[in-house]
């Protein structure tokens, strides 16, 4: 685990985006942790999140001509990432996002921001069913550009009904890589390193039942 990944886990625990306990997921599973990206709801938190996205891009050597944020959750995420890249690395990557409803006046259409061209990286919080990613790919290809990957905050690394994780399904069916700031394995490494025995045992048990590895 890289230093920025440990710092990210410290950050999300500190602002209670990541909580440990007993939670019922939409799937009906009982999870020992919950990741609520809706709590990136202040300027300071959003700015810090953008820095972690930017660090993931630069440390992984991930290249893109345009960043794209799917409405609605992806809009502040893609803007924060573009700002952080410009401030931290001096790299100016244009960004765009879509509207849910087409606009029939002004510039019109469903796309806002930079033109979608070349290699386009999708920025989102998590992948649950992959619906948002599939819709984004249709939009990007429809504009004549090429989706080159997806950047998310957390990869849960747990299998669904298909026997694959949501991220694996996206990668296999759509043929594009998914990059995450951290994965479930990093949460386990973090808990092991910080001596949080009870939470560690709960997450290891969860991984033994639902984990991808």
Curated annotation (Swiss-Prot):
Reaction catalysed by this enzyme: orotidine 5'-phosphate + diphosphate = orotate + 5-phospho-alpha-D-ribose 1-diphosphate
Summary of the function given for this chain in its UniProt record: Catalyzes the transfer of a ribosyl phosphate group from 5-phosphoribose 1-diphosphate to orotate, leading to the formation of orotidine monophosphate (OMP).
Keyword vocabulary terms for this entry: Glycosyltransferase, Magnesium, Pyrimidine biosynthesis, Transferase
Cellular component annotations (GO), alphabetically ordered: cytoplasm
EC number(s) stated in the UniProt entry for this protein: 2.4.2.10
Cofactor(s) this protein cannot do without: Mg(2+)
Protein's GO biological process: 'de novo' pyrimidine nucleobase biosynthetic process; 'de novo' UMP biosynthetic process; pyrimidine ribonucleoside biosynthetic process
Binding sites annotated in the UniProt record for orotate: 34-35, 128, 156
GO molecular function terms noted in the UniProt entry: magnesium ion binding; orotate phosphoribosyltransferase activity
Designated name of the protein: Orotate phosphoribosyltransferase
Pathway: Pyrimidine metabolism; UMP biosynthesis via de novo pathway; UMP from orotate: step 1/2
Domain of life: Bacteria
Complex and partners: Homodimer.
Assigned protein family: Belongs to the purine/pyrimidine phosphoribosyltransferase family. PyrE subfamily.
Name of the gene: pyrE
Keyword match Cell inner membrane: no
Pfam families: Pribosyltran
Residues annotated for 5-phospho-alpha-D-ribose 1-diphosphate binding in this entry: 26, 72-73, 99-100, 103, 105, 124-132
